[in-house]
Amino acid sequence: MNPFVIAAVWLGLGLVSSAVLRRRTARLVALVPLIGAGVTLLATRMSTSAVPLGGLTGITGLDRTGQGVLVAAGISLALVLMLQPSIDVSAGRAIGVVGAAATIAMASNDPLVTAVAIGAAIATLVLRWIDQSPGKATLAAGRVAGTGTAALVAASPFLPLTGFTTGARPVVVGVLLATGVAALLAVYPLGGWATGVIGTLKPADVAPWLVLLVPVVLIIAERIPGGNLGAGTPVYEHVLLIVGLGSAVWGGLWAIRGRTAMRYGRVFMADIALCVAAVEGAPTSPALTGALIIVITHLALAPILLRSEDAGLRWPRRVAWALLSGVPPSPTFWGRLLILEALAAGNIGSTIAAVIAMGAIFVAAVMACSTGIRLTPDHRVRMRVPELVAWLLVAIGVTVGLAPQSLAGFVFGH
């Protein structure tokens, strides 16, 4: 199936759901990402990765990794919506646009098309966030994330850098690309907007960025050095290595000190920052495999941990946090071990920063496991179906921990 058809399915379902569904049937919005993930399985698969630096070759198709990311993220987003206590039907429109844009971005070899597609997704989300909760946090999201997409668009006309492998041009392009990736993935010092959005909006409103768009941008960021950046390659990689490690340490510490309701968001951002630092700072290592293991773990557990603590799922939440703690044989242990191995091959400073970040994430996960929630008997009865789904997701997380590389290879082909 052509990527344009898949994108049209995402967009069409999103528009129809927001126009047709009402409050009683609002939970059917989950069908948008679920069907989108289903049709992505039918995509025409390319044997080579769609590197967004290969020249103006257009949209060629999804490779195995891109297909796996979109399918896993779509299913995870559907489960996030299913487990929410309430859903706004207008979210379907934003989900449809983000899913369509993510499909085009993953299938494109044209850097301008990739940048514009990501920009369309970010613009749609930011406009919805501002409409839902106008204020400093959502306006900051528009400024910073918008600057990130603008940086990618500004860099795209210069790619590939044929004949300009040295001098100022590759360095400027490398800085622009690093700025765009850091802003879109909420890596400090450009990550404050995500913290504000997570603390202001409902989880269902943040989920399209957190569950669907972030994994896509992470994979695209990993592919960027595959093009001919010349002297800009070390600039791009070193900038993301430094800011990624700094962001991971900062996010881990604030996951301990910050509000309980924002703990998962900060842990997620810290893990993604570690992935960015390792994948870009050690591209010839097992870093990508470790990053994919962490991504699939978060996709499996996000539906549980993005649900409000007051809404139940006490024991599944505790087990989910245990799986994120990094204690063996949890899946995050293997993912972070591969990332640490990759960073240790570089220099001692990177290793120390990564160990501090991982230690902070461990402490935050232990604190979350010890949090108690009181539920009335009637509330427990009503929670049977969500708890069943939550335990199923926990079982998937345990399976990832028992066979991390095999399952990551099955999902992402890597």
Question: Whereabouts are the PLM-identified features?
Answer:
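Alpha-helical multi-pass transmembrane bundles of energy-transducing inner-membrane proteins
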Residues: 17-29, 91-175, 182-188, 254-312
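Small-residue-rich segments of transmembrane alpha-helices in multi-pass membrane proteins
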Residues: 32-44, 95-106, 142-160, 204-220, ...
